[in-house]
């Protein structure tokens, strides 16, 4: 439950097309569906820290949320290519109403997120100190 330190690549943008029109960005954009989740199941090595179809048998972070936190969300490529169980999953750049600490993610206000989207591309990296 701690934000990892380092320099990391960013993944695609996932967004709620029912709430937000397609943002201006050079990132690949994927609409979030109700059946999307991000696997955080320590018993599921195959899918750990990956996008999955929601399955009640697999522990996951819901991508389709009632709050607006994941209306815009970019997975940060931490523990990503060959994820190690328990090292951390679902480390995201997402929306917040304020700048209070998160459980390991980076959260910014929607207006700031939209500005960032105009500036970043698939080669952009995030530095977390």
Model feature map: region roles:
Residues 1-103, 111-129:
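Cell wall/extracellular polymer interaction/catalysis modules
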Residues 108:
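A conserved hydrophobic position in a structured secondary element of the catalytic/binding core
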